[in-house]
């Protein structure tokens, strides 16, 4: 009798162990598939980014972008992680700024940022080159990352790259903005901020992931103008070509950086 019970228990444990191993293999398979999909997505976007640069006769920019740009410009909910040995700031105080989106609505790509118990999100699509009318007919020189379920001053904006704060302050079109010059010579432009990170000054050296300020709706008027458009971050990338400032479409770059969230 005891022998039968012992054999029964052994069979039960064997079944449990097999079930556990099968579950572990399934989880590992799903994780590998997700990792492969994210990596493949990043590679696909990198290839499309390079094709876009070829169209602009700017192939030399690709290695600079790939090396310099390391963070998505809007922080994710787990942005307290370590990045290259540098602790990303989270929350903290801010300094008041006293930075376009004319097509609002749901965006194709997006993410979220945890603010207390509420999840604040954003989204973006490829609006580079679209027409703009404020201040005269012109084309859009960047990508608008739109706030979804978040107000001005709620979403944190961080530096995409290491670099130096080259420009800071008010622009009629860009509102409160920050311009960062990267080690590779690229100029990353962040506009329509609600306010700046406390202590940030022109000439400061920053790291990828350094808090720059907070997403807002400033611009399109005299200093302090707000509310002329939905809350968003205008993100632009500029480079020098024979002494002339040029822009690139940063959509594919953002897609690549988005996979790092």
PLM-predicted stretches and their roles:
Residues 3-25:
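N-terminal Sec-pathway targeting helices
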Residues 146, 181, 191-194, 207, ...:
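Residue-level detector of conserved, well-ordered beta-strand and adjacent loop positions
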Residues 177-180, 207-223:
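Short hydrophobic beta/alpha edge segments that flank linear recognition/processing sites
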Residues 23-35:
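Hydrophobic alpha-helical membrane-insertion segments, chiefly the h-region
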Residues 137-150, 179-186, 237-250:
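Small beta-barrel nucleic-acid-binding modules, principally OB-folds
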Residues 159-199, 226, 231:
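Zn2+-dependent peptidoglycan hydrolase active-site motif and core
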Residues 81, 94, 113, 202, ...:
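Acidic, glycine-rich catalytic/binding loops that coordinate metals and/or anionic ligands
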Residues 34-98, 102-176, 208, 221, ...:
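Surface-exposed, glycine-biased beta-strand/turn segments
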